[in-house]
Amino acid sequence: MKAKAIPLDITIEWRYYISMIVSFKSKETNLIWNGEISKKYPSNIQETARRKLRMLNSSFSLNDLKIPPANRLELLKGKRKDQYSIRINDQWRICFEWINGNAHNVEITDYH
């Protein structure tokens, strides 16, 4: 008996995932993202906030935000259910929704 050839359909698919900040919940957060000064937020947090926003923008997954541990990535509860936060300092946070690998409704806030 002759062996029958079985056709194989092998497709290699490359997917490029571009994660990014899709939207801002506050105009003031957008100002900081764009390298401008906000009068609403303390001047001593703005550079750190900008650095953390860049980190958020370049993250491909929520796990990326667990490093450095000082970010203290948290899933929030209550009124902020379905939002995450990372710390700027002990008082200020960057809050956002993570949808399909992108950050939405990003805002800098003192929600305590």
Model-identified regions with their sequence ranges:
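Basic, Lys/Arg-enriched alpha-helical interface segments
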Residues: 1-88, 92, 99-112
